[in-house]
Amino acid sequence: MVQHLTAEEIIQYISDAKKSTPLKVYINGDFENITFPSDFKVFGSSDSKVIFCEADDWKPFYESNQSVIDEIEVEMDRSNSAIPLKDLTNTNARIEPGAFIREQAIIEDGAVIMMGATINIGAVVGEGTMVDMNATLGGRATTGKNVHVGAGSVLAGVIEPPSASPVVIEDDVLIGANAVILEGVCVGAGAIVAAGAIVTQDVPAGAVVAGTPAKVIKQTTEVEDSKREIVSALRKLND
C-alpha cells in the first residue's frame, strides 16, 4: 500500500503554498493600443479578449483601462486557494468529468473515479479501485487494491487535528452507498460495509458490517459471489 503524506507535511504544504484567486475575464472593446501584463494569458482579437490572470493583477489593469472596455464578464470559482487540482496528464486511470482530485492525491493504475467524486490532498486511491459518484475520500484516506467505494460514501479525512489517524481500507473491500467510515478506522481485506452504515471501529478482514454504528452481522463467505464481484472490465483502459 502506498505511503501517504503525514498531516504535518500536508499542513506545511498548505501553509507555504502561494494562495491563488484565478480569474477568467471576457472583455469586448478597443484593445489595439493596449499592452497587457506579461503574466496575463491573453487570447482573442483586437476587439475581443479572453484573459486568464490573478485577481490581484486584474484589479489595477482594469482601473487603468476600463475606459476602453465596452463589455466585461468575470468568472471566479475560488478565492485564496492553496491547493490546485491534480494534473492528470500522466494518470493511468479512468477519470470521468466532474471529479475533483486535488494535487498531492495519488491515483494508482486502473483506478476509476466517477462523476462528482472528491479526492482530497494526501488521499490514495489504490490500483483498480472504483470511487463511485459523489463519494469522498478525505485528506490522507487510503484504499488498497480493487476496492469499491459506493456512491455518496465518505472516508473521513484527517489533516486537522494532525494527531488523528487516517482511514485505511485494505484490498478487495466493498463499501455500499452512503456509508461513512470515521477517522482512524481500518477496514480489513475483503470486508463488506453495507449501504448507509456508519463505521466507528475497525472492521475485521472478511466481515460484513451494517447499521449505525456498524456491527458485524456475518462473514463474506456467506454472501453470494455475484454480490461481491469486482468487474475488471469496468477498469479496462484503451489497449
Curated annotation (Swiss-Prot):
Whether Transferase counts among this entry's keywords is yes
Q: Name one GO biological process term.
A: diaminopimelate biosynthetic process
Q: Write down the top EC class of this protein.
A: transferase
What Enzyme Commission number does this protein have?
Answer: 2.3.1.89
Could you tell me which PANTHER family the record lists for this protein?
Answer: 2,3,4,5-TETRAHYDROPYRIDINE-2,6-DICARBOXYLATE N-ACETYLTRANSFERASE, ACETYLTRANSFERASE
Q: What does this protein do?
A: Catalyzes the transfer of an acetyl group from acetyl-CoA to tetrahydrodipicolinate.
Q: What is this protein called?
A: 2,3,4,5-tetrahydropyridine-2,6-dicarboxylate N-acetyltransferase
- The species is Staphylococcus saprophyticus subsp. saprophyticus (strain ATCC 15305 / DSM 20229 / NCIMB 8711 / NCTC 7292 / S-41)
Ranked from the top, the taxonomy reads:
Bacteria, Bacillati, Bacillota, Bacilli, Bacillales
